[in-house]
């Protein structure tokens, strides 16, 4: 059991029969009344986000999530195949389970598979990935004074707003938490 006062972003808890990851939290101490913790939780089974308020000091169960490092091999229809790098055991995940992460997945990429009591919950991507630009408008010389951006489509289909100097064929470093441009690789 863990106190809600000890909430941290990324903590995994069991509440109301579900497995939830803390996305955001805020300790609130009103002038009148008892303190409480307002939290935003993501259900790891369904991906749904729910806001929940806990009384300060309330205890919740901490979910024991195991992570396995696996390599993404290929897509077979709406099934995506991953391989355990130590045992060579293969695991298939449905497209619905990894819908958000598909925009960043490349073949042979290493990812962490999250498991709870032998049930696969989803995947955890690295903080940044390198993606190749396949389609973007050419940059116009002298158009950089405003520091603007233009859309660029990557090899996975993700559209990222990039600076004007980025061209087709360039490799970008993209933040996987929000899909934003970090730098050129």
UniProtKB/Swiss-Prot annotation:
Gene3D superfamilies: 2.30.30.30, Nucleic acid-binding proteins (2.40.50.140). One of its GO terms (cellular component) is cytoplasm. Its main location: cytoplasm. One of its GO terms (biological process) is peptide biosynthetic process. It is found in: Cytoplasm. HAMAP family: EF_P (MF_00141). This is Elongation factor P. It comes from Bacillus velezensis (strain DSM 23117 / BGSC 10A6 / LMG 26770 / FZB42) (Bacillus amyloliquefaciens subsp. plantarum).
